[in-house]
């Protein structure tokens, strides 16, 4: 039996057992009300949380058992899983809290469940390279059996969350209302944050200063993050003065509402060189990893300088909900930005890469950004995006609006030697749209690339709408069932800032132009 077959059977078994248990106490009652279905979902999620906690405990036990026998990448994979399972418990607990509120926002609940599914898949991704790893597979049979059982438990958890996501569809009135059109920042960017984004740096209005020359509170960014308060409900601003900071930065989940302000792209630079080739998982390779919600970055560069031969080497990994990046650059080659999960927004940013250089399963909008393809390795294809939506009910995807898809200076002289594509489907329901953007002539007339064989060609959603430039001609685009020539503003608008990242309430106009809708 294949792993996929086991996954399907486990999913169906769980759903049947769960429903029979719940319905046994309501034999004569029809579950038609919102409250009934909500209680079904809450019961399912509570059981899933118990399963996640058990899996986390088993992962810890196995890690202790294997200890020094593990390769560095396998150690990273275990660390990834323990962190991601902890995040999953948090996401599911938050989802339950929102469901039980007086006016649950089901779009946000779906985002949380989507993030939980992404977490389990990311955990599995970390072990993908371990199938042939002697340190893991050539341990005693009992240990190997436990490892395989843990992998199966992750499939099971993801399946349970998927079932809950399906049940949400049956709650009456779950369809979000019409979005109000306005101009401004998203509702989760407050008035004071808006001023911080617009105005020059005033050191009297920041909480901490990082400076390599000793003129600030700290000389490293890591020290400043450690000094920031936990679970802050107000903005905590860290001004990072001009300089190159060779650090791998992790902003943990408890460090909320952090804001980085630099002195400009190329002037304030955070850089490191972890990579898959050097024994790191893609998740752990990030120069900067952000988990704490409400993160904002302005006027700085995130760089992974591992190089094109090192494979996955992430500059930024963000699972920060309601995070925003303004006038920043992100520079690497393969897997530059890992838009891992939750809702994110990028404005006037420059992104440099070669292969899948924007990837992940967040709900993310790139507006007025420039995507630069760099010179890849010989015979390598250039792919701008690889979106990771694995369930048709996930509200996730990559939306690129009013942006520029270009060749970087190092590619321009030799771009005729390489083929470039807008994206390829990393997962079954991959979803990416490009709207009102300039697409240069480096993009192949087909536009999009297969992942492998016919995988996801019928289930993906790749859309283009009112683009311009020599690469925007759709005459010879792929003929896949999932490719869409978006023809109406109604269809296109669902991927605009308002509906797509839940920006249904906005602030008034600001000095930074920001269009809510198309």
UniProtKB/Swiss-Prot annotation:
Gene Ontology molecular-function annotations: enzyme inhibitor activity; pectinesterase activity
Matching InterPro entries: Invertase/methylesterase_inhib, Pectin_lyas_fold, Pectin_lyase_fold/virulence, Pectinesterase_Asp_AS, Pectinesterase_cat, Pectinesterase_inhib_dom
UniProt binding sites for substrate: 312, 424, 426
Pectinesterase 40 as annotated region, ranges: 207-504
Alphabetical list of SUPFAM superfamilies matching this protein: Pectin lyase-like, Plant invertase/pectin methylesterase inhibitor
Annotated pathway: Glycan metabolism; pectin degradation; 2-dehydro-3-deoxy-D-gluconate from pectin: step 1/5
One annotated Gene Ontology cellular component of this protein: extracellular region
One example of a Gene Ontology biological process annotation: pectin catabolic process
Catalytic residues in the record: 335, 356
Alphabetized Pfam families for the sequence: Pectinesterase, PMEI
Catalytic activity: [(1->4)-alpha-D-galacturonosyl methyl ester](n) + n H2O = [(1->4)-alpha-D-galacturonosyl](n) + n methanol + n H(+)
UniProt site (Transition state stabilizer): 334
Residue span of region Pectinesterase inhibitor 40: 25-167
UniProt keyword Acetylation, yes or no: no
Tissues in which the protein is found: Expressed in flower buds.
Glycosylation (residues): 46, 53, 58, 69, 141, 156, 213, 217, 230, 273, 368, 473, 508
Residue pairs linked by disulfide bridges in the UniProt entry: 349-369
Primary location class: secreted
Signal peptide: 1-24
Note: The PMEI region may act as an autoinhibitory domain and prevent untimely PME activity during transport.
Family as reported in the entry's similarity comment: In the N-terminal section; belongs to the PMEI family. In the C-terminal section; belongs to the pectinesterase family.
Function summary: Acts in the modification of cell walls via demethylesterification of cell wall pectin.
Designated name of the protein: Probable pectinesterase/pectinesterase inhibitor 40
Protein's gene: PME40
């Amino acid at each position: 039996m294949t792993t996929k077959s086991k996954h399907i059977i486990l999913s169906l078994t769980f759903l049947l057992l769960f429903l029979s248990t719940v319905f046994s106490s309501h034999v004569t009652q029809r579950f038609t009300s919102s409250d009934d279905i909500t209680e079904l979902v809450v019961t399912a999620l509570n059981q899933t949380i118990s399963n996640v906690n058990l899996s986390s405990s088993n992962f810890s036990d196995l890690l202790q058992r294997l200890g020094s026998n593990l390769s560095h990448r396998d150690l990273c994979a275990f660390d990834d899983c323990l962190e991601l399972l902890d995040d999953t418990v948090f996401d599911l607990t938050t989802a339950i809290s929102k469901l039980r509120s007086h006016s649950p926002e089901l779009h946000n609940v779906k985002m949380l469940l989507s993030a939980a599914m992404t977490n389990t898949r990311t955990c599995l991704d970390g072990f993908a390279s371990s199938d042939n790893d002697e340190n893991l597979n050539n341990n005693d049979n009992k240990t190997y059996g436990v490892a395989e059982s843990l992998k199966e438990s992750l499939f099971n958890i993801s399946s349970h969350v998927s079932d809950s996501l399906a049940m949400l569809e049956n709650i009456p009135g779950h369809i979000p209302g019409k979005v109000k059109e306005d101009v401004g920042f998203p509702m989760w960017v407050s008035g004071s944050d808006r001023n911080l984004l617009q105005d020059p740096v005033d050191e009297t209005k920041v909480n901490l200063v990082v400076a390599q020359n000793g003129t600030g509170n700290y000389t490293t960014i890591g020290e400043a993050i450690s000094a920031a308060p936990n679970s802050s409900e107000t903005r905590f601003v860290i001004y990072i003065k001009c300089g190159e900071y060779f650090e791998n930065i992790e902003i943990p989940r408890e460090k909320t509402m952090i804001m980085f302000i630099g002195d400009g792209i190329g002037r304030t630079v955070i850089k490191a060189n972890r990579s898959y080739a050097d024994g790191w998982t893609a998740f752990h390779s990030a120069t900067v990893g952000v988990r704490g919600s409400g993160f904002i970055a302005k006027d700085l560069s995130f760089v992974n300088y591992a190089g094109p031969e090192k494979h996955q080497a992430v500059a930024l990994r963000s699972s920060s909900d309601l995070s925003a990046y303004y006038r920043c650059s992100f520079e690497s080659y393969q897997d530059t930005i890992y838009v891992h999960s939750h809702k994110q927004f990028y404005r006037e940013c420059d992104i440099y890469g070669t292969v899948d250089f924007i990837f992940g399963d967040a709900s993310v909008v790139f507006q007025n950004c420039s995507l630069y393809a760099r010179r890849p390795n010989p015979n390598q294809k250039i792919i701008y995006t690889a979106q990771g939506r694995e369930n048709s009910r996930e509200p996730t995807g990559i939306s690129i609006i009013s942006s520029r898809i270009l060749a970087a200076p190092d590619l321009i002289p030799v771009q005729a030697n390489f083929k470039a594509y807008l994206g390829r489907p990393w997962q079954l329901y991959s979803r990416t749209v490009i709207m009102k953007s300039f697409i240069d002539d480096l993009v192949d007339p087909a536009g999009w690339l297969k992942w492998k064989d016919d995988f996801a060609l019928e289930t993906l959603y790749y859309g283009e709408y009112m683009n311009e430039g020599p690469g925007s001609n759709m005459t010879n685009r792929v003929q896949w069932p999932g490719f869409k020539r978006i023809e109406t503003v109604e269809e296109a608008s669902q991927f605009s800032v308002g509906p797509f990242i839940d920006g249904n309430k906005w602030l008034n106009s600001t000095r930074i132009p920001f269009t809510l809708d198309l």
